[in-house]
Regions:
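Threonine-centered tandem repeat motifs in low-complexity domains
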Residues: 1, 44, 65, 88-90, ...
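C-terminal segment of classical bacterial N-terminal signal peptides
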Residues: 23-37
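Conserved anchor residues at repeat-unit boundaries in beta-strand-based tandem repeats, strongest
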Residues: 51-60, 73-84, 96-107, 120-129, ...
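Short N-terminal segments immediately surrounding and downstream of signal-peptide cleavage
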Residues: 37-57
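Ala/Thr-enriched low-complexity intrinsically disordered regions
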Residues: 102, 115, 123, 132-138, ...
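Bacterial N-terminal signal peptides that target proteins for export
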Residues: 3-24
């Protein structure tokens, strides 16, 4: 084809297609165009990339496509040679972005899909997640809320792969501050969090009943607190890494209580146990049971002092009875057993060997 083709044919062609029809370079195309009007053309970038689309004053303005030298690709709107408006940017190896652009950056609403399967949908500012959005990762973590400079910040909620959902104040990409966590087992926490875990004062409510209110550390009961159990029992005192540890008061629903030291959830050390029937024990406990030196007082006034083991009066001891009688000797499982002497209130005294509470003749 040559420039001698009929003027009638040329007059029917749109101006935006003239450069491509003539097969000329961009400079020749501009000879036939209004320098301030849009026309179609091709631009070769300094690094070898190639762009084509609507041109104005030698720059892409309007719809266009750029294939960059690094393998990335953009298709969408341009202003003054930069992506601006709606478009799709496809990375050679890092997924793609679809949404709004401003002056060459992701700006406004959009969707960023990563090659590893991670996905963000929301608002962008200068190429970063910024504003409100949702980030979903392939490892099962989902975040909905506010972002600043590419990271979760402000108010938001994390949903983890195990079903736990925590929402609240977001700092440094995690829930740090006041928040609420709903767990997969239907348990619930409300209070202070650090790095998505209960930390500081808070309340933990169990789905099956009962609750804990007090101090937490790295997701565990730690410090002073109150634990109410579903069976009605109650503990108030110190906790260490989730267990009752240190000084505390344990109250039983049916009556009675224990006050003293705990070790790994059990009565341990010098404490006082008051029973629902009115009896009481003051002395040493080991693994939750009376064991060691102690004094056991019955509701009726009987009093036994001596050695205990496995929750029973075992070993040497003395019992002073409410009627004035007195026994001193050996015991087994709470009964007189072994050598002992029995002094009656009237002064009568018997000594001998006892078996299961009975004097042997």
């Amino acid at each position: 084809m040559n420039l001698g083709m009929s003027s009638a044919i040329l007059s029917k062609l749109p101006r935006v297609g003239l450069a491509l029809l003539l097969g000329s370079n961009l400079g020749m195309a501009l000879l036939f165009a209004n320098p301030h009007s849009a026309m179609a053309g091709v631009i070769t970038l300094p690094d070898g990339g190639r762009c084509e689309g609507e041109l104005s004053e030698g720059k892409l303005s309007g719809s266009g496509i750029c294939q960059y030298a690094n393998g990335d690709r953009y298709e969408g709107q341009f202003i003054n040679g930069k992506p601006h408006g709606q478009g799709i940017y496809t990375f050679k190896e890092e997924g793609r972005y679809q949404g709004e652009f401003a002056l060459g950056e992701f700006n406004g609403k959009g969707v960023r899909e990563f090659a590893n399967g991670n996905r963000y949908e929301g608002t962008f500012k200068n190429g970063e997640f910024d504003g409100t959005g949702t980030f979903t990762s392939t490892n099962g973590i989902r975040y909905e809320g506010s972002f600043t400079n590419g990271s979760p910040s402000g108010r938001g909620a994390f949903t983890f792969s195990n079903g736990t959902r925590c929402e609240g104040d977001i700092k440094e990409g995690k829930v740090n501050g006041k928040g609420v966590c709903q767990y997969a087992n239907k348990n619930r926490y409300e209070g202070e969090l650090l790095n998505n875990l209960p930390h500081g004062p808070g309340i933990y409510t169990f789905a099956e009943g009962g609750r804990y209110e007090g101090q937490f550390s790295e997701g565990q009961f730690h410090g002073k607190g109150v634990r109410e159990y579903p069976n009605g029992n109650r503990y108030e005192g110190e906790f260490v890494k989730g267990n009752t540890q240190g000084q505390g008061l344990f109250t039983f629903k049916e009556g009675g209580r224990y006050q003293g030291p705990f070790d790994n959830g059990e009565f341990s050390g010098e404490g006082v146990r008051e029973f629902a029937n009115g009896n009481s024990y003051k002395g040493t406990f080991v693994k939750g049971k009376m064991s060691g030196k102690g004094v056991y007082v019955f509701k009726n006034g009987d009093r036994c002092e001596g050695e205990f083991s496995d929750g029973q009066f075992n070993g040497k001891g003395t019992c002073i009875y409410a009627n004035g009688d007195r026994y001193q000797g050996e015991f087994l499982n709470g009964q007189k057993h072994g050598q002992g002497s029995y002094l009656y209130a009237d002064g009568t005294k018997v000594e001998g060997n006892w078996q299961q509470g009975q004097l042997q003749k």
